[in-house]
Swiss-Prot record:
GO terms for biological process: defense response; killing of cells of another organism. The lineage of its organism: Eukaryota, Viridiplantae, Streptophyta, Embryophyta, Tracheophyta. It comes from the Eukaryota. This is a cyclic peptide. Contains 3 disulfide bonds. It comes from Melicytus latifolius. This is Cyclotide mela-7.
């Protein structure tokens, strides 16, 4: 399935494809 956003941002970056940092949590683009 598609990766799920929601990890904590690390130095302003998200490592899950299609996610962006909405500090402090990654959100779907």
């Amino acid at each position: 399935g598609l990766p799920t956003c929601g990890e904590t941002c690390f130095k302003g970056k998200c490592y899950t494809p299609g996610c962006s940092c909405s500090y402090p949590i990654c959100k779907k683009n």
